[in-house]
Amino acid sequence: MDVRAALQCFFSALSGRFTGKKLGLEIYSIQYKMSNSGGSSPFLESPGGSPDVGSTNGQSNRQIQALQFKLNTLQNEYEIEKLQLQKQTNILEKKYKATIDELEKALNDTKYLYESNDKLEQELKSLKERSANSMNDKDKCIEELRTTLQNKDLEMETLRQQYDSKLSKVTNQCDHFKLEAESSHSLLMKYEKEIKRQSVDIKDLQHQVMEKDDELSSVKASKMINSHPNYSTEEFNELTEMNKMIQDQVQYTKELELANMQQANELKKLKQSQDTSTFWKLENEKLQNKLSQLHVLESQYENLQLENIDLKSKLTKWEIYNDSDDDDDNNVNNNDNNNNNKNDNNNDNNNDTSNNNNINNNNRTKNNIRNNPEEIIRDWKLTKKECLILTDMNDKLRLDNNNLKLLNDEMALERNQILDLNKNYENNIVNLKRLNHELEQQKSLSFEECRLLREQLDGLYSAQNNALLEVENSETHASNKNVNEDMNNLIDTYKNKTEDLTNELKKLNDQLLSNSNDVETQRKKRKLTSDQIGLNYSQRLNELQLENVSVSRELSKAQTTIQLLQEKLEKLTKLKEKKIRILQLRDGPFIKDQFIKKNKLLLLEKENADLLNELKKNNPAVETVPISVYDSLNFELKQFEQEVFKSNKRFSRLKQVFNNKSLEFIDVVNSLLGFKLEFQQDSRVKIFSCFKPEKYLIADLNENTLKSNLDADIEGWDDLMNLWVEDRGQLPCFLATITLRLWEQRQAK
C-alpha cells in the first residue's frame, strides 16, 4: 500500500509539471497570435511606407523568426521530455505492475500454503482419528482374545485338574490292584506249596491205607480160616490200636479233602480276581493312553481345521487372481493415464488421491501372500508407480520450500527495515527527552534568577525607603510608591508568564509521554505480530523440511526395495528348477508329517467331493454314506493306533526307568542309612534293618504310629521310644540307636 501511494504522488507531480508547461506554451502562442493578428501583415508593403518603417519591419521579422526558432526548440525539448517522461512512466508502470503481480503471487502462495496447511492438518486429524479408532478396535480385539485365552486357560486348568484327579485315582487303583495281585500271587505260591505237600502226604497215606487194607484182608482171611481163634490180649490191643489209627487216618484224609476243596475254591476266587485285575489294568492303560492322546488329538484336529480353512482361502484367492489379473492391470493403466492428464490446478486433489492409493496399495501388499513371482512382479510395478508419485510430490514440495524461503527472505528484509525505523524513532525519542531535560534546567535557572532579582529589588526598596524617609518629602514619596507598584506589576506578569510556560511545558511533556507510550505499544504489537509471523513461517519451513527429509527417506527405502526386487527377479529368471537339489532324509519326521498331511488332505478332498455329490443327488429314501468317509476314518484310526503304540512304548520305557531309579534309590538308602524301605498301602512304610532283615518297623504316616517286632531283641525298647520319639521327637536318632544296638549284638555273637 505504501508503494502504491508513493507512485500515485509521483504521477500527480509529473502531471502537474506537464500541465504547467502546457499552460506556459499556450499563453506564449496566444500572445504571438495576438501580436500577429493586430494591423497589417509584416510581409506586405504599406503604400505610404517609409524606410524607417521597413527597417522596423525587418527587425520585427527577425525577432519573429528568432521567436519561432525558440518556439520550435521549446516544442522539440517539450516533446523530448514528454517522450522521456512517457518512457519513465511506462518503466515505472511496468515495475509497479510487476511488483503488484509479485505481491499477488506471494499472497496467492501464502493463501495456498495456508490452505494446504489446513488440509494437511485436517488429514492429520482424520488420520489420527482413524489410527485411534483402529487402535481402539485392536485393543478391543486384544481384550476379547485375552478373555477367550483366559477362559481357555481356565478350561485347560480344569481339564488338567480333572485329568490329574482321574489319573491319580487310576494310579491308586492300579497300585492297589498290583499289591492285591502280588499278595494273591504270594498266597497262590504258598497254597500251591501246601497243596503239593498235602498231595504228597495224601499219596503216602493212600499207600499206607492200601497196605492196611491188604493187612485187613489177610487178617479177615486168616479169621475165616480160623473161625474159632484164641485171641491174646496183645493181639487184641494191637488190633484196637490199628482200628484207631485207621479211623484217625480216615478223618485226617477227610479233613485234607475239605481243606483241598476250600483251597481250590480260594484258588478259583484268586484266579477270578487276577483276571479282573488284568482286565482293569488293560482298561486303565487304555484310558491313560486315550487321556494322554486326547489333548494331542484335539490340537491336531484344530490345526487340521485351520490348515483346511487356509487351503480353501488360498484356493479362492488363486481363482480370483487368475480371473481378475488382466482386469487389474487394465484398471491400473487407466488410472495412471487419468492421473497424468489432470491439470496443475487440481494438484491437491491428485495428492490426496495418490496418498489414498498409496495407503490402499500398501494395505493390499501387506495382505497378499507373496508365494509367486507374478505377485512379486505386480508388487514391483505398484512400488514403481508409487515411487514416481512420490518423486512428483517431492518436486512439488521442493518448489514450495523454495517459495517459502524467498518469502522468508522478503519478510526478513521488511523486518530489518522496520527495525531500522524503530531505531530511528527511539533515537528521536531520546533527543526529545534531552531537549525536555534542557528546558527543565532552563526553567529552574529562570526561577532562581527571578528569586535573586526579587531579593535585590527588596534590598533596593528598603534602601530607597530609608533615604526617602530621611530626605524627601511627601510628594516624592508618592512618586516612589507608584514606581514600586509598577515594578510589582511587572514581576507579577513575569511570574504569570513563567507559570504559563511551565504549564505548557508540562502539557507538552504529557503529550510526548502519551505519544511515546502509544508508539511503544504499537511498536510492541507490530513486533509481536511480525515475530509471530516470522515464527509461523520458520515453523512451517522446519515442518516442510522435516517432511522433505521423511519423503526422501521413504524414497530411498522404496528405491532400495525396488533394487532388491529387481535382484530377486534376476535371480528367479536365472534359476533353473532342474539344477535345484534339496538334501533331505528319506524317512525323516518332517517328511512323514508332510506325507500324512498330504494323504489326509487327499482323503478329505475326496470325502468332500463325495458328500457334495450325495447332496446333489438328493435321495431322501436311500441314506448312504460314501466310502471316502470310511477311508478317512480308517486312516485316522490307524494314525491314532500308531500314536497309541508310540505312547505305550514311551510309557513302558518310562515305567522301566522309574523302576530302575526306585531300586537304585532303595539300594542307596540301604547302603547309606542301613535300612531297606518298602512302601505299602495307606501311606505305610515298612523298614528292614540290614543287621537283622527278618525284623522290621512299620511307620504309619497318616496316624503317626510306629509298630515293630524288635522290642524282644532290643533291651529298653520302651525307654528308647519315650526318650527319642515322644520327648525329643527325633525319629532318625531313634533309628540310629537301633542300628547301633543291632550292630553291637551282631558283633557280640
UniProtKB/Swiss-Prot annotation:
Broad class of the protein's primary localization: nucleus
GO cellular component, one term: kinetochore
Subcellular location: Nucleus
Example GO BP: cell division
Pfam families the record matches: MAD (PF05557)
Organism domain of life: Eukaryota
The keyword Iron-sulfur belongs to this UniProt entry's keyword annotation: no
Biased composition (Low complexity): 331-370
Additional comment: Present with 656 molecules/cell in log phase SD medium.
Family matches, as PANTHER family: MITOTIC SPINDLE ASSEMBLY CHECKPOINT PROTEIN MAD1 (PTHR23168:SF0), MITOTIC SPINDLE ASSEMBLY CHECKPOINT PROTEIN MAD1 MITOTIC ARREST DEFICIENT-LIKE PROTEIN 1 (PTHR23168)
Protein name (record): Spindle assembly checkpoint component MAD1
Gene: MAD1
